[in-house]
Swiss-Prot record:
Cited function: Catalyzes the transfer of acetyl from acetyl-CoA to desacetylmycothiol (Cys-GlcN-Ins) to form mycothiol.
The keyword RNA-binding is annotated on this UniProt entry: no
EC number: 2.3.1.189
Enzyme class at the top of the EC tree: transferase
Binding residues for 1D-myo-inositol 2-(L-cysteinylamino)-2-deoxy-alpha-D-glucopyranoside: E38, E183, K225, E238, Y276
Subunit structure: Monomer.
Sorted UniProt keywords: Acyltransferase, Repeat, Transferase
GO molecular function, one term: protein-N-terminal-alanine acetyltransferase activity
InterPro entries: Acyl_CoA_acyltransferase, GNAT_dom, MshD_Acetyltransferase, Mycothiol_AcTrfase
Gene responsible for this protein: mshD
Pfam families: Acetyltransf_1
Designated name of the protein: Mycothiol acetyltransferase
Binding site for acetyl-CoA 2: 242-244, 249-255, 281-286
Family, as annotated: Belongs to the acetyltransferase family. MshD subfamily.
Length: 305
């Protein structure tokens, strides 16, 4: 067996990006969960991710392991994600990748384990890491399941996204609502444009709430998403982003906007819907529990103890 080699790069070339994308696909098929987030997938192709560094581990010129490191900014630590080719597992590649990104990213670096699979838990234990953040995936059925009636609150108007003219308000509310969030809170027009270019994008699935007294200042929005059928897995909807401006919270807008999206997804014929929520977001968890969502799996960000 030949010795594998690690190397860092600020940008993957075309062949590397294709090989990494294929590796991520194999890992997803083997594990039942994607090892890298949507933002990370964009960074692989070079479409996004300022400052992202890529670590590849090769064996005989074949990429057998991949990690990416998103630099820290302000109070937010550096974040890393990684994947090991299913055919190359059991050789310590995952542990080496984690050790290297922790060294490169600094003492507060966090490493995502999507699905928190047993192999990831074993690496974390071996390296003395502890869970620093949890991201929960919740799901609920749509087909054959009741949804509360959608009743628009008094003094509130709902409409859908009209195009780039809405972007400044969407980005303003997003930044304010997710100021604490190292990934979501840093969105710019580039992230908006990337998502508008995706095959799943549908302006009719982005719901926006305004006060009837001021229909230029956005109070909150709910962006839905549809994941297409993959193999035996049917298409599924997603509560992609729900953002409520700090000055509009506590008025029931989160529930209203979520329900608007759920009705839309059900009307499209989808059988189920998923969402992601921080494990310590008690308010959101309470809202989603009342709407019939249940925990499906957990992503854990590990850090040095």
């Amino acid at each position: 067996m030949s010795a594998s080699v690690q190397s860092w790069t600020d940008r993957l070339d075309g062949a590397q990006a294709a090989d990494v994308s294929a590796l991520l696909g194999r890992a997803t098929a083997a594990d039942g969960t994607a090892p890298v987030s949507e933002q990370g997938v964009h960074a692989v192709s070079g479409a996004g991710g300022d400052g992202v560094r890529h670590l590849v581990e090769t064996d005989a010129d074949r990429i057998v392991g991949y990690a990416q490191l998103q630099p820290g900014h302000g109070e937010h630590p550096a974040m890393a994600e990684l994947a090991v080719d299913p055919e190359a597992r059991g050789r310590g590649i995952g542990g080496r990748l984690v050790a290297e990104v922790l060294s490169a990213g600094g003492p507060d670096t966090r490493v995502w384990a999507h699905g928190n699979l047993p192999a990831a838990q074993a690496v974390a234990q071996r390296l003395g890491l502890t869970g620093a953040r949890e991201l929960l995936q919740l799901r609920r059925p749509l087909a054959g399941a009741e949804l509360p009636e959608l009743v628009v609150l008094e003094g509130i108007s709902l409409r859908v996204y009209r195009g780039v003219e809405d972007d400044p308000e969407v980005l303003r509310v997003n930044a304010a609502a997710f100021a604490w969030h190292p990934e979501q809170g840093s969105w710019t027009e580039r992230e908006m444009a990337e998502r508008r270019a995706e095959a799943w994008f549908d302006p009719a699935g982005l719901f926006m709430a305004f006060a009837t007294s001021d229909e230029k200042r956005l109070l909150g929005f709910h962006w839905t998403k549809v994941h297409p059928k993959q193999g035996d897995e049917p298409a599924i909807g997603e509560v992609y982003v729900v953002a409520i401006g700090p000055d509009a919270q506590g008025r029931g807008l989160g529930r209203l906007l979520t329900l608007a999206g759920l009705h839309y997804l059900r009307d499209r014929g989808l059988g189920a819907v998923l969402l992601y929520v921080e494990g310590d977001n008690a308010s959101a968890l309470h809202t989603y529990d009342r709407l019939g969502f249940e925990r499906f799996h957990t992503d854990v960000a590990y850090a040095r103890a």
